[in-house]
Regions:
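Juxtadomain low-complexity/linker regions and immediately adjacent membrane-anchoring helices
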Residues: 1-77, 94, 101-117, 123-125, ...
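Beta-sandwich interaction modules
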Residues: 85-89, 130-168, 239-241, 246, ...
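Acidic/polar, low-complexity linker and loop regions
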Residues: 55-73, 81-85, 125-142, 219, ...
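Beta-sheet repeat architectures centered on beta-propellers
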Residues: 247-249, 260-269, 279-289, 300
Length: 358
């Protein structure tokens, strides 16, 4: 069994959440499959984005309203539980955040996390569960950060959070490395930056209004809240940027910058660079970055597509397609860097291409 460490918030960000993906989040497609009880507050709240909130004096027919999962008192079983299907095909796990915000006097005294790999939800009844995080104490109204000393050896499709014996938990984050399922044919185009391909944002200049990891998740989202947005800049020459480690080294054939829902706060223009680097997070000013998309104006609520000059045509879903892609046909890249000028919001960043090797 891997050793478990209790980390501070800053250490958890530095070691875990900035390097791995929350594989159960609702915005990624994580889904509650079943639970033992949710008398006071729904289990689905556990995997919602954003920090939990408190509305003092608000009641439901079951009792005081809580932004989290809360079970009834006096559980006759050792623990209450909830089973969650990952938002990716499967993943290995490195750590978790358990937030008991606003649960004080009714918080979960202890938790554990288990995982299993099944082909179908109907197989869960006979599934074999493996311990990921052992039974660990929790305190009232606080964020708890637990990390393994190594990724789990096995990938999991579902996880089970237990609370002993009952009570409330506001949020549950589970960080790990998605297990990408790549097509056998290396010439098949895939989104190398997508979270399901193993893409992850490893560095950024700012994420004041919206997190950079939103750039790589499925779909176009529902509002500005599920994109990447930086604060307003006040200095001449300012730019913001994000560096994405691709899920696999590959050739870049097509890039998409989607400004969906960003109407008065989209970037004036963008550039895209790429690099082949042995470093997990190469410096944003590394001289080896190569220009892939030169400075190009953007517009509000649009899918901007950038393709090679020799490409036959672009995607029918794009609002605007430009044949401006450079350095893309014969070079292998491991990372891509999106720069927005001078600041603003972008919903999604896609880097389509072909893997360099199996």
């Amino acid at each position: 069994m891997s050793a478990i460490s209790v980390l501070s918030h800053d250490d958890f960000v530095a070691q875990i959440s900035s390097k791995y993906t929350d594989v159960i989040g609702a915005k990624l497609g994580g889904k509650i499959i079943s639970f033992s009880d949710e008398w006071f507050a729904e289990a689905n709240n556990l995997i919602q984005p954003g920090l939990p909130i408190r509305q003092v004096g608000k009641f439901t027919p079951a009792g005081a309203w809580y932004d989290g999962w809360e079970t009834r008192r006096h559980n006759p079983e050792p623990a209450d539980w909830v089973i969650i299907k990952l938002g990716v095909a499967s993943a290995t796990i490195i750590g978790t955040e358990i937030d008991t915000a606003f649960f004080n006097g009714n918080h979960a005294p202890a938790i554990s996390v288990e995982g299993t790999f099944v082909a179908d939800d109907k197989d869960l009844d006979s599934a074999k569960w493996e311990e990921i995080i052992p039974k660990t104490e929790c305190g009232p109204s606080q964020r708890h950060f637990f990390a393994r000393d190594a990724l789990t050896e096995a990938p999991y499709t579902h996880v089970r959070l237990k609370q002993y014996p009952d009570g409330g938990i506001a949020r549950f984050r589970l960080y790990g490395k998605p297990t990408a399922v790549f097509p056998a044919d290396l010439n098949t185009e895939i989104d190398l930056a997508h979270v399901s391909s193993g893409g992850i944002a490893v560095a950024f200049s700012d994420q004041h209004f919206g997190a950079v990891d939103n750039l790589l998740i499925p779909g176009r989202g529902k509002d500005m809240g599920d994109g990447w947005e930086t604060k307003r800049s006040r200095e001449p020459g300012h730019v913001d940027w994000v560096i994405v480690k691709l899920g696999a080294p590959g050739y870049v054939d097509r890039v998409i910058v989607d400004t969906a829902n960003f109407m008065g706060n989209y970037p004036q223009s963008i550039t895209v660079h790429a690099i082949n680097s042995p470093d997990a997070d190469p410096a944003h000013d590394d001289p080896n970055w190569k220009l892939v998309v030169d400075r190009t104006k953007t517009g509000p609520h649009k899918i901007h597509e950038y393709i090679r000059a020799d490409a036959a045509s672009g995607s029918p879903d794009a609002d605007e397609t430009q044949k401006v892609l450079t350095s893309a046909n014969d070079e292998v890249f491991t990372h891509a860097k999106l720069t927005i000028i001078p600041d603003g919001g972008v919903k999604r960043f896609r880097v389509f291409g072909r893997r360099a090797s199996a």
